Amino acid sequence: VAIAMTQTGGGCRATNYIGFIRRALQNAGMHQIPVVSINAAGLESNPGLKFTPKLLIGAMQAIVYGDVFMRVLYRMRPYEIYPGSANRLHKYWQQVCIDSITGKNRNSFKKNIQGIIRDFDQLPIDENLKKPRVGIVGEILVKFSPSANNYLVDLLEKEGAEAVMPDLLDFFLYSAYNSNFKYEKLGKSKKGAIMGNAAIKALEAVRKTARKELEKSRHFHPQAKIEELAR
């Protein structure tokens, strides 16, 4: 058993969470559980952890699954005609995606994305009801973790609003795209910019199906590209 925690390497709290986790484990009498840092800044070395292509692809697919779920669930649930129908549909597809990611049917990623968007797009909702849309922004863990933000999405929906959450993948795209600014304005290496742009292409390739299906849907908007957001 081990805990893997990402570290950004910057000055925000995301760099320091790993230290708090280790301290919490020690205080709980579970100091034997290792906490592995996942970072691209060389903060810690983890010789026992190897990022294989299969692991990286699975991680990217998991992120896209989560982003698509947030996009379709938060869009449809506030307007559902049958209470609980959106959550039931989410629970069904969640298990399908878990089975896919854990290797039971890894090649079904494209088919699953198509099915998720199709089924949520057909979910019965009140088409005449309009609610204020409230965007959620902020520090990355607090933004995406319900337990860290006191279940903000649930609160907004109870108060009669529709929550809008940006994609987690966009954070990685921003980090990769930022290497261009560092090269052009801060004197960083060109190699970093090249690698960043290659990462953008790889990430966009993974969510290509999601973007295409969202564009064809009636109720959802596709993700904006990082180049457009940067402008």
What residue ranges belong to the model's regions?
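An N-terminal assembly and electron-transfer interface module characteristic of large anaerobic redox
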Residues: 1-231
